[in-house]
Amino acid sequence: MASGKAAGKTDAPAPVIKLGGPKPPKVGSSGNASWFQAIKAKKLNTPPPKFEGSGVPDNENIKPSQQHGYWRRQARFKPGKGGRKPVPDAWYFYYTGTGPAADLNWGDTQDGIVWVAAKGADTKSRSNQGTRDPDKFDQYPLRFSDGGPDGNFRWDFIPLNRGRSGRSTAASSAAASRAPSREGSRGRRSDSGDDLIARAAKIIQDQQKKGSRITKAKADEMAHRRYCKRTIPPNYRVDQVFGPRTKGKEGNFGDDKMNEEGIKDGRVTAMLNLVPSSHACLFGSRVTPKLQLDGLHLRFEFTTVVPCDDPQFDNYVKICDQCVDGVGTRPKDDEPKPKSRSSSRPATRGNSPAPRQQRPKKEKKLKKQDDEADKALTSDEERNNAQLEFYDEPKVINWGDAALGENEL
């Protein structure tokens, strides 16, 4: 093993050098730490580990007869609000006759102790291997030639050929040793992918819990990353992120209301249910590459089909009518509401709830004025006026349960 200094006399993971380096001392040192890195439970209250093979870590410096020892449970905690909180236990390996349980013989029963032995080991003998002084020696990386612990445990992967070049690299090396490895290790269990998925799911859950806490810097980054990867942050307008709305070309979706409200507009959430995923866009589109003076232009043509019997078919049609080439328009039900009068004001003739007396209408004069106004209208204006006058669809859209798919968004 190679010498080097590491901060603290603890069993915290540290970078490890080759197993084939200088042999560890034959007697105990001033420290009382395990020679090996720990295995860590994935959950709280996990039962003691079981091993596919002998459970003794690989170490070519140890004689076969001394390949026996015990795994000892170490409770762990992390600081939190209201005091420290428990985290899943760590288990450290010690050779028989060394470590915190040095007074026990192999096989003696004690809580938090699991005895292991390799084939051909003399379990009646006691090891002269001693324990590790963290100030002088690094941890061995764990390797199990005949099978490691069961799927309830994991350990941080440390490459065998990683060395230390002094104290200045200790922190970065330790951080790297604690990071998930993309490489496999001999004895690593096949369910490590499940562990990765579980950790990824926890990260997503944590992000969802903190989803409303988007900092100003994060929002700015969301709005100004590469154009094809942008998303609209809260309180941003559509044109702040994707530019002005247009007609008949790219950027033609969104009316004035949607442009102003951004993701607060419920129609955005509804339509995102029809937008293809990245994989669907790449593999389900007609992709057309074209070299231009400013670079490579990629065009993706994708069609989403909403069946006619879809419960929200009419709502999707309505949104498309409103938002495709919708710049300069607003939904018909997006009319300014009259301000409510304060109930604390005394009733007067001006604000009395009693209906005002209506004057008789002068039918002939009004009709004449209407006829003159109609003559000044274009055909498009007449059509718009007709929609405004006779538009009687409900102002509140009931999306129902089928507005979004069960697994969408």
UniProtKB/Swiss-Prot annotation:
Residues 215-331 form the CoV N CTD domain. The modification Phosphothreonine is found at residue 378. Pfam families: CoV_nucleocap. Keywords: ADP-ribosylation, Disulfide bond, Host Golgi apparatus, Phosphoprotein, Ribonucleoprotein, RNA-binding, Transcription, Transcription regulation, Viral nucleoprotein, Virion. InterPro entries: N_prot_C_CoV, N_prot_N_CoV, NCAP_gCoV, Nucleocap_CoV, Nucleocapsid_C, Nucleocapsid_N. Changing residue 208 to H: In strain: Isolate Vero cell-adapted p65. ADP-ribosylated. The ADP-ribosylation is retained in the virion during infection. Phosphorylated on serine and threonine residues. Residues 15-31, 162-179 have a biased composition (Low complexity). One of its GO terms (molecular function) is identical protein binding. Residues 1-84, 121-194, 327-396 are annotated as: Disordered. Residues 226-333 are annotated as: Dimerization. Residues 31-156 form the CoV N NTD domain. Residues 70-84, 358-367 have a biased composition (Basic residues). It comes from the Viruses. Residues 29-160 are annotated as: RNA-binding. The modification Phosphoserine is found at residues 190, 192, 379. GO terms for cellular component: host cell endoplasmic reticulum-Golgi intermediate compartment; host cell Golgi apparatus; ribonucleoprotein complex; viral nucleocapsid. CDD domains: CoV_N-CTD (cd21595), CoV_N-NTD (cd21554). Disulfide bonds join 281-308, 320-323. It is found in: Virion; Host endoplasmic reticulum-Golgi intermediate compartment; Host Golgi apparatus. Residues 180-192, 368-384 have a biased composition (Basic and acidic residues). Packages the positive strand viral genome RNA into a helical ribonucleocapsid (RNP) and plays a fundamental role during virion assembly through its interactions with the viral genome and membrane protein M. Plays an important role in enhancing the efficiency of subgenomic viral RNA transcription as well as viral replication. Belongs to the gammacoronavirus nucleocapsid protein family. Homooligomer. Both monomeric and oligomeric forms interact with RNA. Interacts with protein M. Interacts with NSP3; this interaction serves to tether the genome to the newly translated replicase-transcriptase complex at a very early stage of infection. This is Nucleoprotein. The lineage of its organism: Viruses, Riboviria, Orthornavirae, Pisuviricota, Pisoniviricetes. The gene is N.
